Every structure is written in structure tokens, then in C-alpha cells.
Regions:
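Donor-binding and catalytic core of enzymes assembling or modifying cell-surface/extracellular glycoconjugates
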Residues: 191
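Conserved alpha/beta-domain cores
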Residues: 2-188
């Protein structure tokens, strides 16, 4: 449920995060909020920025690259931009040029294109391999059987830095099913 303002929403979300962190006995710095700003105007990003947010997620490469450039021109240079959507091969140059982190690399061809198109003056692009942990055909992500090949490829590329995995679980009310899928993702990461 949404409140009246971005500030109220953020306060509510951070309160929920703090409670979850306390319940799980985790370090409070181990969880970061990623504000999804796709389709939102730059003014809303600025409002969240003024409330202390620095991580923003976008999934429309063209719209995002324009927004990112506008915000940089206004002096918002310390925002960490995450690309969070499916990657179309014809959009890899925009993603490689404007983003800091890509959370949805699922194919070798995409990794190679991001590496080739990352400008030399930028630090390596941090990437997460999107894994299809629910094994649902309608969900994107690398099949578990193909992960080792994709990891090796990414590790061989100079302009990419493998940061971890990302997975989207089944849309289910079964807490057990959700925990099983994400435990599988954690096991892959620990491997």
C-alpha cells in the first residue's frame, strides 16, 4: 500500500526492512533498498535521492539512459544505476554505457556484448547472473545447467565483474516453495 509521498513510502519501507533485519539477526548494512524508478520522472528520483537513496533500478534502456544523463547534468553523479530487466541484444550499448550494475545477464552473447561495448574510461560493469530458479519457461534467466559456462565466460571478460546471482521465484503463497528456490540459489552461489 502506498502512502501520500515518496518520503512516507521510503520511511515505511525502511521500517519494514529494519524489522526484517532484526528478526533475521543480520547486519543492518547487509540489506540495501533498490528504488525502482522505471517510468518515473527524474523529479521523483531527485526526491528519493534527497531522502538518502542512492541505488535506482531501471528496465527500459532508452528511457533510462536519457534520465541518467539528465540527472548527471544536474550534478547527481553518485547514484548507482542498476539495470534490472530482460536484456535485448540491440540495447546492450546503452546498458554498457550508462549503468553501474546489471542484474539480469542470462546469456553468453549478452555478456560478450556488454564487455565489448563498455567504454574504456568506466570501471568494469558489475553483473549478476539471472538464474531461472523456478524453472518456469515464461521466466527469463540462465538455466541452472548452463551457469558454469556463463560464469567462466564472464570471468574471462576484462570489462565485467561478476558480483553474484539474481533469481525470481515462483509466484506462490507457499513460503516453503519460495525458501526452497532461494536456498537453491544460495547453494549455487556458495559452490
Amino acid at each position: 500500500q502506498f502512502m501520500n509521498s515518496i518520503t512516507e513510502n521510503l520511511n515505511h519501507i525502511h521500517s519494514s526492512i529494519d524489522s526484517a533485519v532484526d528478526n533475521c539477526k543480520r547486519d543492518e548494512n547487509s540489506v540495501k533498498l533498490l528504488c525502482v524508478s522505471k517510468t518515473k520522472p527524474k523529479e521523483m528520483v531527485i526526491e528519493a535521492y534527497n531522502d538518502g537513496e542512492r541505488h535506482f533500478g531501471e528496465s527500459y534502456a532508452v528511457e533510462a539512459s536519457e534520465k541518467i544523463e539528465q540527472l548527471k547534468e544536474l550534478g547527481y553523479n553518485d547514484i548507482v544505476w542498476h539495470f534490472i530487466g530482460p536484456i535485448q541484444k540491440n540495447k546492450t550499448k546503452l546498458i554498457a554505457t550508462h549503468f553501474d550494475i546489471v542484474e539480469s545477464v542470462d546469456r553468453v552473447i549478452v555478456a560478450k556484448r556488454l564487455d565489448e561495448q563498455r567504454p574504456d574510461n568506466l570501471k568494469p560493469l558489475e553483473v549478476l547472473i539471472q538464474v531461472n530458479i523456478s524453472d518456469e519457461s515464461q521466466k527469463s534467466g540462465c538455466a541452472i545447467a548452463d551457469i558454469d559456462e556463463l560464469i567462466k565466460e564472464i570471468q574471462s571478460l576484462k570489462k565485467l565483474k561478476l558480483r553474484g546471482f539474481m533469481g525470481i521465484g515462483k509466484d506462490t503463497d507457499s513460503r516453503e516453495e519460495i525458501q526452497k528456490e532461494f536456498a537453491q540459489l544460495k547453494n549455487l552461489f556458495d559452490k
